[in-house]
Amino acid sequence: MLASRPSIVQHLAALAVVQAVKETTGVALNIKWPNDIYLRTAAETVQNINLTKMGGVVVAASSNRNGLTLVLGVGVNLDNAKPTCSLNRVAEDQEGGGKVGKEKLIASILNHLELLLDMVEAGGWEEVEQEYYKAWLHSNQPVRVTDKEGREEDVLVVGVDKFGFLRVHCDKSGEDFTVFDDGNSFDMMAGLIRPKSRV
């Protein structure tokens, strides 16, 4: 299953980080589609979100006649308090939380990722979808999609599909459609999805 949908791996890796951080430090993090990990730093509404980026995930995939190769990169700000804050600082300040070492966090991330990969391989994206949505930041978020010709359309984020691409709903047309992460930039603070600039 994963060989036909390698794009889902970045979402599983992000979820593994969120689960591992919660398990090892008690800190609850969230996922910004497609691959960033954030800490909610204050009370907010859908339009006023106060977030601090704590990490991210990147996956590079290649295939040949021998199969699929994935290279996974995971970054978490564990100890660097500047320019914003570190995970261990947040954990120390949180009641019931505590610092975690690199080795313990990496082991926990890999354990969670292995479990998630096994679950998806056995039963599909649906096996982990609800856990993913508990951690992600975008349920019912209004955004504006801009296509390559510059046309804009207001839509509502409704989820991710079985490949990990963003599903949105347009009230005007009544249609759902998919927004791919490749070639698009998601400015969550501005509520805008637009084609990435090519240099």
What annotation goes with each model-predicted range?
Residues 2-29, 39-199:
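Long, positively charged amphipathic alpha-helical accessory segments at protein N-termini or as interdomain linkers
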Residues 31-33:
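Short loop/edge segments at beta-strand edges and connector loops
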